[in-house]
Amino acid sequence: MRIRPGTRRTAGSVAGLALAGLLAATAVGTAPAAAAPTGNGAGGSHRVEYFPQPGGAGRTVEVPADAPARTGRSSGASLSAAESAVDGTVGEQAVTGSTDDRLDVVIIGDGYTADQQDDFHADATAKWADITALEPYRSYQNLFNVWTVDAVSNESGISGDPGADVVKDTALSSYFWCADTERLVCTDIDKVASYAAEAPAADLVVVIANSTKYGGAGYSGLQAEGYPFNGVSTLSSDHSSSSLIAAHEIGHSVGLLEDEYTYPSYGTWTGGETDGPNSTTYTPAQLIEKRAKWYRWLGQSDPTGSTVGTYEGSAYYPYGIYRPTSTSIMRELSSTDFNLPGREAMIAGFYRAGNALSTSLDTNTAVKYGKRITVSLAVGTTGLARTDLRWYVDGVEKVHARGRTAVTPGSLGVRADGRSHKVTAEAVDRTDAIRDPAVRALATDRLTWSVRATGHRK
């Protein structure tokens, strides 16, 4: 399911490239001048996010669209026939339904040789398990398909590990020390797109770099740049904190959440209300008066340990704009929780991209009185989710059929009266994690069949 295109609009976006100067003063490490990456000449750039240290707040910076020429696969070191046979192989790590009904994640490894692809698959499984251990990913993981694509590198590991002068010949040209910043792992997005295209569908891409060193990055809003997927996260394979980078970045791509951290030099936000569901210029009284943003959650105890309110500082600006809680995973990675408004926004994003209710029976073809109608539910009643399945005939609920995943029109009371009838299956997620009626509508799926009630039971 293609994620609805959208560009993250944050209060901080108006600052543009002025952020680069700030980053120079705040970055954890700075590469030697001689080791600074040099683009391969194609031009263009991406704005990416990275986290200078485990558990810390993020930073954003403009980086070249193309990886440095020195980090790419050498033209003189092509793959052997056996390696080429492995390169681009697609695996089904966790496929739960049709690509039309799911949010499709593609995981690609970089810095894994042909003999290390089993290691890549183990790392992909482990990293996705880390992400889906967090709510609301845990409760809604069956709305995702997860595919792997094998990318064979000529050398093990990636450039910049352990030092800025280390150069590796890898499939995706991933490298530490991007933009002279040690923990920032950039990759060649065009190469990523080429490998991701091997999978049946790709809404989001995760690039796992074969490294024990902490690092990663997040590219979002890529559909607006013409890519088929909306976000790419990079992360190192063998650092325990790197998975949180992807969990945060998916918050942007799927939940449309803004960053909640700030830059002291940005001062006071003087613009109008922002689009993000987790930033506002309104006070609690104004939120209630305007029935805006997270007013339904005000005063509630939050998974982050805070109470939902308005806490000054968000979307890069320390003053004049507010976030829902004192901390969350969108503010710093020392928190592994989305706050309640953020959690609701994530669930909305899951349902924008995926369908909880599906069937193999064509809804465009009329069914007969005795035809068995079977549906599947991707989301049940575990964790946060509370999916309620009901059946209707001509708009009237058949209470006795609640929860059934297989019925016949006859069992629902359709009579063989020669008239046409409508049978509808409706799945509604009645989770307490949703309070906004608009999000509840997204969490509602319906399938309808016409019934030819002609007296024939087959």
Map each language-model feature to its residues:
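Generic detector of well-ordered alpha-helical segments enriched in charged/polar residues
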Residues: 121, 129, 190-194, 203-205, ...
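Generic structural hydrophobic/aromatic packing signal, biased to beta-strands
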Residues: 1, 48-50, 105-108, 146, ...
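Secretory targeting and sorting signals
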Residues: 1-36
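Solvent-exposed, acidic/flexible segments
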Residues: 117-121, 239-247, 323, 339
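Active-site-proximal segment of zinc-dependent metalloprotease catalytic domains
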Residues: 85-104, 108-113, 125, 129-266
